[in-house]
Amino acid sequence: MNAKPAKELLLQLGQCSPQDTGQWTGAYKLPPELFEYYREVGPDDIYIEIGAETCTIPSLAKLENQQVGYRVHPRTTERFSNWPGHWIVVASIEASPMIYCDGAVFYAKARKGEWMLNKLFDNIYFMAASLATIGLFFRKWVEVFDENYNLKSEHCEQLTNDLTELFDSKAKAELVVANLGF
């Protein structure tokens, strides 16, 4: 997966524009791949409705703010000792972060205690394209949840099929669907 299909999918849900390194406000160095992603895809603070939750994909200018509560304490801005320096939150679904780490993107369900990461995407472009695909799925379908607010089986199957097309792998699609709680 590269920038072009990821950007095309995101553009159906929000705005994208090239963003340069000068828009990064953080005190630490970002990996070159993230600058490339923001230059080529350039999500402009995209909010994606995923069922009852909202996924946030920040612009480069707001990426540092996305680290608050994970990397640093929200009031004191003191660095959390249990958050490795090479983890960068590049998106979130409510309070659950998508973490860029060594080229891949991991998902960690928000909870107390140690972070338990699950690798969901081989690169940030797959993450962007997948989140857009999921957002487009929820935009297309109504009444997708049962009375217990679980995704109905036929819709879960459709979402898995949509992601299978993207990944060219049903196993990867099922992994994403399961980890995101569908």
Regions found by a protein language model. Name each.
Residues 107-142:
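Compact, glycine/acidic-enriched structural inserts
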Residues 15-24, 111-115, 141-148, 161:
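Charged, low-complexity surface segments at secondary-structure and domain boundaries
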Residues 2-3, 27, 113, 117-120, ...:
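Intrinsic-disorder-associated interaction segments
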Residues 89, 106-107:
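General beta-strand recognition
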